[in-house]
Regions:
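EAL-family c-di-GMP phosphodiesterase catalytic domain
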Residues: 2-12, 18, 40-45, 126-133, ...
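Bacterial c-di-GMP phosphodiesterase EAL domain
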Residues: 1-117
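Regulatory sensory/coupling modules that transmit signals to nucleotide-handling catalytic cores
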Residues: 110, 121, 258-261
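Alpha-helical scaffolding segments of alpha/beta enzyme cores, especially the outer helices
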Residues: 107-114, 139-149, 199-202, 224-227
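Short, conserved glycine- and acidic-residue-centered signature motifs
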Residues: 67, 136, 140, 193
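Helix C-cap/helix->beta junction micro-motif
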Residues: 90, 118, 150, 206-207
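Distinct, well-ordered alpha-helical segments
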Residues: 79-82, 103-116, 133-143, 165-176
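Short loop/turn motifs at secondary-structure junctions
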Residues: 90, 118-120, 173, 229
Length: 261
């Protein structure tokens, strides 16, 4: 565990952001809705992949600590990378991953008091189902109401990939659902998936839940999900994940150029 603790102590994480955009275009442009924040550890010889790092941490009971650390670090870096953008077009929404069990911790309550960005600009993505069966529907409902009162929104990630995702959806009643990339990939070649997605998107629309198609990489995928009324899209077709340090440099350069224009 020393390697995980050391990574946190020395902030050995690269923070990236990826755009989430409106699927319906206005003037041939997909308007920006927000960003998902991704924190990738700078891997040494101990781990071969980011997934292995986080799996190792979870197996040693460090998911909650890592959640709090990476959310705080990511939001701080995101805030600092978007100061110029915020002054011009308002604060974009920022999506961060969190385990449900973390939301029931004292550490989360402490962070919530002093979030680096306004709570109304934060969307919490329940990215895994760890701890879901530990709590009653009543406990989860109370927690979701507390988050709503604080101004935060909730998304359920990887929806459509089995019972656990649908179980989470039924308990949480989220503001957003994120359609798993495996359902998005090459959907224009699969009539069965097309019919299923159309029915699900129509259902979520009736429930006033916004939908985000993840992992969009092709124009045909954009066209299909736009046609069936999906609210937002995310993926390499729109933007590859961008280090926030690079975003900061780009925004500062644009600001300097505008002053000299």
């Amino acid at each position: 565990m020393q390697c995980v603790n050391s990574a946190m102590e020395q902030q050995q994480f690269q923070t990236l952001r990826q755009s989430i955009v409106d699927l319906p275009q206005r003037d041939n442009v997909h308007a920006l809705h927000g960003f998902e924040i991704l924190n990738r550890p700078l891997l040494g010889t101990e781990f071969s992949s980011v997934e292995e790092f986080y799996s190792f941490s979870a197996s040693h009971g460090r998911s909650r600590v890592l959640d709090i650390f990476t959310i705080n670090l990511g939001l701080q870096r995101f805030r600092d990378s978007t100061l110029s953008e915020s002054s011009q077009s308002g604060q974009p929404l920022v999506f961060v991953n969190i385990h449900l069990s973390t939301l029931f911790s004292d550490e989360w309550q402490d962070l919530l008091v002093d979030l680096p960005v306004p709570p109304t600009s934060v969307v919490l993505e329940l990215s895994e189902r760890e701890g879901l069966n530990t709590y009653s529907n009543r406990d989860v409902d109370f927690m979701m109401r507390d988050l709503q009162r604080a101004g935060l929104k909730v998304a359920v990630d990887d929806v459509g990939m089995g019972y656990s995702g649908l179980h989470t959806l039924a308990m949480v009643h989220p503001d957003y659902v994120k359609i798993d990339r495996q359902l998005v990939f090459n959907i224009d070649h699969d009539p069965y998936r097309q019919h299923m997605m159309k029915s699900l998107v129509e259902y979520w629309k009736r429930e006033d839940v916004s939908t985000i198609a993840e992992g969009i990489e092709r124009e045909q995928e954009v066209a299909f999900f736009t046609e069936i009324g999906t609210t937002f899209g995310q993926g390499y077709w729109f933007q590859q994940p961008e280090p926030v340090a690079v975003a900061t440099q780009r925004i500062e350069a644009q600001a300097r150029d505008s002053l000299h224009a």
